[in-house]
Structures are given as structure tokens and as C-alpha cells.
Amino acid sequence: MFNVATGLFCYLQRPSIEDADTLLEWLQDPLLQDKVFGMEPDLQQAQETVQHWIEENAELFGAENIVLIAKHSKKDIPIGLVMLKNIDWRNRSLDIHYLIANEAHRNGPYGPEMVLTTLVYIFQSLNFHKVYGYVYNNNLASLNMANFAAKEEGILKNYTYVNNNWLDYHLYSINQQDFKVFLDKNKNTFLRHHFKKGLIH
């Protein structure tokens, strides 16, 4: 399976049948069901979801949704998922969702690296215009990361009820031009190794 995009710490691939067992395990993880997927699928539903992801990803262009699996650059083990949703090929926009499913890699550089690698793929390979992201107000790590590079478009107050609390939903966006400015601003600091290795241009 070829790499869709490559970063320093991870690379992205379209999931294949070889990834089915891993995806099935993630779909049945209680933490991910509660925090990410928002559902508790039984085994058959989970199997159908995995099959749909693999079949949908066989189509290179034109799909409304694309699922990418992130793998560790050195260990070649699956560490997370990137989901591109509501893809508007005409207006060149989409929504991005990501998760570190492998518990051992939820800390460290993997989350930011997955997002950076995905944005490079979206803007430099697919030539999209704008990306939207959504973050709950209790996800401080993702909020900090979003505020670092993206613009907050608005807040959906008291959007969902979780563990006896109402959570707000923050909407962020970044367009291709702003991403270019972000890369240029940081090319001599924390992105210097990405540029040196030709991972970003």
C-alpha cells in the first residue's frame, strides 16, 4: 500500500484489508466509542463500518469521505485515524477529524504531526482551498493546537451533553493561503527538519 503523505513521525495510508483487524479493535474501544465515534456498534455493525471504509477508500477521487490510517514512521505500526468528511470537490473544502487510537502514542508529537501531514496532503497534493475542524471545549490539547495555526469561526454553545455537563463545540478553519503563511513563518524553527527532508515545500 502506497503512502498518501509522509511526515517526520508518521505517514498516512488508505486502509487496506490488512488493516481491518486494527480498525475493528479501535471501533470497539470503549474510550473511543465515547469520545470520538459517538456510538457503541455491535460486532456486526463494526465489521460493516470497517468494510465500508476500505471499499470507500478504493476510490481515489470523488468520494464524500476519506479515511486515512496513520502509521508510526519507524515502527510501521498503526497509531491513529484521519477522517476527511463532507468533501466538496467543486468548492475545494472539507472537514477534518483525527484521533490517536493507539494509547501508547497519545502523548508526544504524533497528534500535531498527523494534523500537519494531513494539511500538507490536503493543500499541496489535493490543492484544496479550505479545511474546517471541530473541537469540544474539554479537549484542551486540540484547542491549543487549533488556536496555534487556525482561525476560530464560532462556538456552538451547549452543543452536547456528556457526563452530566454541557460541552461547547468550537469551529475552526484554515485556508490554503493562511497555511502557506504558517509554513513560511515556521520554516526556520520547528518545521526546519520537515523542509530539509523535503516533506513540505
Task: Annotate each language-model stretch with its function.
Residues 1-20, 28, 71, 75-201:
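Acyl-donor (CoA/ACP) binding surface of acyl/acetyltransferases
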Residues 30, 57-61, 176:
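A general structural signal marking secondary-structure boundaries and capping sites
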